[in-house]
Swiss-Prot record:
It is found in: Virion. It holds the Pfam family TMV_coat. This is Capsid protein. Coiled coil: none annotated. It comes from Sunn-hemp mosaic virus (SHMV). Capsid protein self-assembles to form rod-shaped virions about 18 nm in diameter with a central canal enclosing the viral genomic RNA.
Length: 163
């Protein structure tokens, strides 16, 4: 048994572009209470997001049966917000950019605080947008909706009977 031979545009469905719906949404909900003022806080969220990405289907492994629900992270609406969320956590070496690191000016310190606040605000905004999309079912697949949206057909092979 296998999926029909995919076209190149269907190969993306076999990659680590999924997240298990309930654990992922729970992680997003829990993350909303963080301030993300430290790089370690932003790194922790980024790591949680990246470790949530899984592959649930392959050419020879069918999408899990109901009641399994997975978020397709390459869905155009989800991907835009998810990518923005990942980018907003990546502020390492950009929070403090100074000419002379041994003599940081007050203006440079204030700029670093603003960048940290901007990153934290962006993370919170992206978390809320992503939760809103997921609550509305955007990019959420079960087996039936996955096979319909992807155009992949599960082929059941039968073995010929011998007399």
């Amino acid at each position: 048994m296998a999926y029909s031979i995919p076209t190149p545009s269907q190969l993306v469905y076999f990659t680590e572009n999924y997240a298990d719906y309930i654990p992922f949404v729970n992680r997003l909900i829990n993350a909303r209470s963080n301030s993300f003022q430290t790089q370690s806080g932003r790194d922790e969220l980024r790591e949680i997001l990246i470790k949530s990405q899984v592959s649930v289907v392959s050419p020879i492994s069918r999408f899990p049966a109901e009641p399994a629900y997975y978020i397709y992270l390459r869905d155009p609406s989800i991907s835009t917000v998810y990518t923005a969320l990942l980018q907003s956590t990546d502020t390492r070496n950009r929070v403090i950019e100074v000419e002379n690191s041994t003599n940081v000016t007050t203006a440079e310190q204030l700029n670093a605080v603003r960048r940290t606040d901007d990153a934290s605000t962006a993370i919170h905004n992206n978390l809320e947008q992503l939760l809103s999309l997921l609550t509305n079912g955007t990019g959420v697949f079960n087996r039936t909706s996955f096979e319909s949206a992807s155009g992949l057909t599960w082929l059941v092979t039968t073995t010929p009977r011998t007399a």
